[in-house]
């Protein structure tokens, strides 16, 4: 009981002090919110507008060719495939360049899952 009472006292003090500071946090949050709308240079709306202006400027400087090339390169990524001893199905095929195929293993009757294994033959 002697060791429990200091911890209980500490818990009560933490709860009382924690609730007292909750109002201060609300006030600080409201002040920050008001400051953001007072100073338009710091507001998120101003950042979005600036971003749009920069995109227009970039497009005029580099043209649409640059944006189309980056989109094409982004979409031409090699499709991912599963490695050895990893679960596979129609949506997640095994890697053909690693010479793996999706087969029913010995535990298929229990797990009802296929796994990537080396091609036999």
Swiss-Prot record:
Tissue specificity: Expressed by the venom gland.
Modified sites of kind Lysine amide: 120
UniProt keywords, alphabetically: Amidation, Cleavage on pair of basic residues, Disulfide bond, Ion channel impairing toxin, Knottin, Neurotoxin, Secreted, Signal, Toxin, Voltage-gated sodium channel impairing toxin
Localization: Secreted
Keyword Signal: yes
Entry-linked InterPro entries: Toxin_22
Protein name, per record: Mu-hexatoxin-Mg1a
Alphabetized Pfam families for the sequence: Toxin_22
Family: Belongs to the neurotoxin 14 (magi-1) family. 09 (magi-1) subfamily.
Lineage, broadest ranks: Eukaryota, Metazoa, Ecdysozoa, Arthropoda, Chelicerata
Functional summary from the UniProt entry: Insecticidal neurotoxin. Shows competition for site 3 of insect voltage-gated sodium channels (Nav). Induces flaccid paralysis when injected into lepidopteran larvae. Is not toxic to mice when injected intracranially at 20 pmol/g.
Residues that make up the propeptide removed upon maturation: 21-80
Domain note: The presence of a 'disulfide through disulfide knot' structurally defines this protein as a knottin.
Signal peptide: 1-20
One example GO MF annotation: toxin activity
GO CC annotation terms, alphabetical: extracellular region
First-listed, main subcellular location of the protein, grouped into a coarse class: secreted
S-S pairs: 81-95, 88-102, 94-116
Highest taxon listed in the record's lineage: Eukaryota
């Amino acid at each position: 009981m002697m060791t429990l009472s200091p911890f209980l006292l500490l818990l009560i003090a933490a709860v009382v002090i924690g609730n007292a500071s909750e109002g201060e946090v609300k006030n600080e949050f409201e002040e920050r919110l008001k400051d953001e709308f007072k100073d338009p240079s710091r507001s998120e709306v101003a950042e979005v507008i600036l971003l749009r202006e920069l995109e227009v400027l970039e497009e005029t400087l580099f043209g649409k060719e640059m944006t189309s090339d980056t989109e094409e390169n982004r979409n031409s990524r090699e499709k991912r495939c599963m490695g050895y001893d990893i679960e596979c199905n129609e949506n997640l095929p095994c890697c053909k360049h690693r010479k793996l195929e999706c087969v029913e293993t010995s535990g298929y009757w229990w797990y009802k899952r296929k796994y990537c294994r080396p091609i036999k033959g």
